[in-house]
Amino acid sequence: MIQSGCSVAMSNAIVCQRVSRAPPGAVQREPVRLRCEDGQYLDATWTWAVPQPHAVVVINAATGVARRYYQAFADWLAQRGYRVLSYDYRGIAGSLHGPIRHCRASMADWARYDIAAALATAAKLQLPILLVGHSAGGNLLGRVPGLQQASAIVTIGAQNACWRLWSGWRKWGLALVWYLALPILTQAYGYLPGRWLGASGQSLPRQVARDWANWARRRQYVFDAPGLPPARYSEFAGPVQVWSVSDDSYAPPAAVADLARRFGPGGGTLLSVSPAQLGLARIGHFGIFRRQIGMHLW
């Protein structure tokens, strides 16, 4: 997915120097706090292993997934010469301050403020920036202020989450989630309990869950949703890889392809991987970032 000693597997937009792999144990991690434009703070981690990195990677998480889930991937990148910034969206894990029922964070805030703050922080290093977006962390990118600061984008399991792009029973099951289950649960609890999100395990603040459901009822999902900065997907000039996983029920091929076509003047490069290609039984929506699975692909 990402190669060192070349052009980040996509084009010459990010030129990588030939960097020797750092010795075991050389990875360093520094907890930091990111200040957003609206004054909110996010818990984040810088990960690196060489004093002079050749590029910066910003990892933008999936909905309800804590940054620690991506730490193995961040370590792997650091050992190959990247400086890596991972962070928790507001209302999630380390960036949840106080009871979740009182949290006013929205998914729109994630794009408008949180991803924008991470991107601005990375830009201070004056190095090429690669944005890695998992699921929502990829499909929100085109609504992020300052996206032009990035040099390249890789998304994994990012998609148009409108239920109409699924097929068979999953299509109607997802419609029930967006129209009934998620609104009812959110109203009943005052937030969306993490156990309903599968592998991620992080509960969602009320308005985050509402934004997610409201957008997913729309044919254009977040791409033309009101209340966000203007959409810039088609204006992004750097290389874009949009990855799908054959057994990812959260992001079927049609939904991933719908996102890919929106990037740049000619669309992003649509790529796919299957468990069989890697000699695995399953990958799913979250597997690529687990060390035992991801090492076959990274």
Segments (PLM) and residue ranges:
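Active-site glycine-rich loops that stabilize anionic/oxyanionic intermediates
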Residues: 62-65
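Alpha/beta-hydrolase-fold enzymes
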Residues: 132-220
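Short beta-strand/loop motif that positions the catalytic acidic residue
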Residues: 236, 242-244
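Short alpha-helix in the alpha/beta-hydrolase fold that links the catalytic acid
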Residues: 252-262
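Catalytic active-site module of serine/aspartate enzymes centered on a nucleophile-bearing elbow/loop
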Residues: 273-298
